[in-house]
């Protein structure tokens, strides 16, 4: 179904003329898993009569790239909501992870699935792995089922010993162009993220925890309450 995603500000993060800067009252048209138009809402809507319209607050950007998925999924434990009273809601790592003892594969599998969902809630649509594939079968299965794009690690930042990678891709300190997996382009895969902030500066300051929607290959896979 043809869908228009509209927002007060669209940040295409592209280099093509007309897509190299912010678009006020912008929109992205999506048909299936592909982007069919990017521009002002009026222009996009004119070219897509009858399309369903989803209006979002804040800024709409390309989906983000997470450089450290394996660390986050296999070296952090993501508590089940039923464990929140005992373990809290944030990922456990280091000494707190060790205190859990040996976890069964079933429990690890649940943690990995929840970790993937947490990435989606941070606007992530692509994850990096050496050779663009995961050798850990639990991680590989969870990522494949989610629909996340797997990319290579060329250009990935290093992680200091003892430093915990963050679910927020902006924690690496890059600007938007350096944090997204690729720009919004007509004909490209419809991987989008929406953040409830007024502009790119606020997005970099407040981070991906402000995400209110994630679209993966045209599918709305996360919507904040």
Q: What is each PLM-predicted segment?
A:
Residues 1-47, 168-205, 215-225:
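N-terminal metal-binding scaffold of metallo-dependent hydrolase/deaminase domains
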Residues 80-94, 102, 151-167:
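Long, charge-dense
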Residues 121-161:
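Active-site loop-helix segments enriched in His/Asp/Glu that coordinate
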Residues 118, 142, 186:
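Hydrophobic/aromatic ligand-binding patch that stacks against planar heteroaromatic rings
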Residues 95-111:
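Active-site mouth loops of central-metabolism enzymes
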